[in-house]
Design a protein with these regions (language model features):
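N-terminal secretory signal peptides that target proteins for export/translocation
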Residues: 1-3
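Sec-dependent N-terminal signal peptides
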Residues: 5-14
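Sec-dependent signal peptide cleavage junction
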Residues: 17-30
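Short, glycine/serine-rich, charged loops/turns that create anion-binding
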Residues: 20, 160-162, 229
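Short acidic, Gly/Pro-enriched loop/turn segments at secondary-structure junctions
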Residues: 24, 98-100, 232-235
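N-terminal catalytic cores of secreted or lumenal carbohydrate-active enzymes
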Residues: 29-220, 224, 241, 245
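Acidic helix/loop microenvironments that form the catalytic cleft of cell-wall polysaccharide enzymes
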Residues: 224-230
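Aromatic- and carboxylate-enriched substrate-binding clefts and catalytic-loop regions
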Residues: 230-250
Length: 250
């Protein structure tokens, strides 16, 4: 048998079983019909899209220092002449411990809107917070320019973490085990909001929401947790703020 016949025979033998399988599979498979009802797609807002938009994190924190870039971005994203976005999610930063320098992205290091705070003598409660909205001036500049470009813009606030002094690890990047020598072993599967400070965190959100409203930005809805049931958010992460919550722990 010459070389060409050998190759032809091998190919024919190799293809026969597969051809049979394909044929049998096609004959045995019955069509499945799926009928979609768009009206029942979502129980929220009667199944209708409320709008379309973008989160301000963290490009607003990066661009907001420049009036030129701020206005250009607001027009491009939110005006009728641009994309016409009508929803904006505003990231209320927890604000990490000022002695920490592990978040190495300049845009994701979102400052908290406060300049000082005071804890109770046992450290279990927040007695007072001195608020300062100018700490988040860059993002605020973008939000105001966006509202000017689209007066009907819907703002939703959201938190990635509570302020560092409300967390178990003293870090807004996430959870971990606090060792006897004060060091922390990172563990993104551990809840990081201090058990005694759920009410304090809720008050922080309420106070900050009023602070923004008094400065022209009204949050019409608020998401207090962002992707909470993951193991992403560990102590000392270089990426961003984050806080794990077990289901039912919030």
């Amino acid at each position: 048998m010459n070389k060409k016949k050998i190759i032809s025979t091998i190919l024919a033998c190799a293809m026969l079983p597969f051809g049979g399988l394909i044929s049998a599979s096609a004959q045995d498979t019955k069509p499945t019909y799926v009928q979609l009802n768009p009206a029942d797609a979502s129980p929220f807002n009667n199944g209708e899209f409320q709008g379309w938009g973008t989160a301000l994190c963290w490009w607003a924190n990066r661009l907001g220092y420049s009036e030129k870039l701020t206005n250009a971005a607001a027009e491009a994203f939110f005006s009728d002449e641009g994309l016409g976005l009508d929803i904006a999610r505003y990231n209320l930063g927890g604000g990490d411990d000022p002695t920490h320098n592990h978040i190495n992205r300049s845009d994701s290091k979102v400052p908290g809107v406060y300049s000082d705070y005071k804890l109770s003598s046992d450290g279990k409660d927040v007695e007072s917070i001195t608020y300062d909205i100018t700490k988040d001036q860059n993002q605020l500049n973008i939000a105001k320019a966006a509202l000017k470009a689209n007066p009907d813009l819907y703002f939703e606030g959201f938190s990635n973490s509570a302020p560092y002094f409300m967390t178990k690890t003293g870090c807004t990047s996430g959870g971990g085990t606090v060792n006897s020598d004060g060091t922390v072993t990172s563990n993104g599967k551990l809840n990081n909001l201090n058990d005694d400070m759920y009410d304090d965190f809720a008050k922080f959100i309420a106070d900050a929401t009023k602070l923004f409203k008094d400065n022209g930005i009204e949050f019409k809805s608020y998401s207090p947790m962002n992707e909470p049931d993951t193991d992403y958010w560990g102590y000392g992460s270089p990426k961003q703020e984050g806080c794990h919550f077990d289901p039912g722990a919030s």
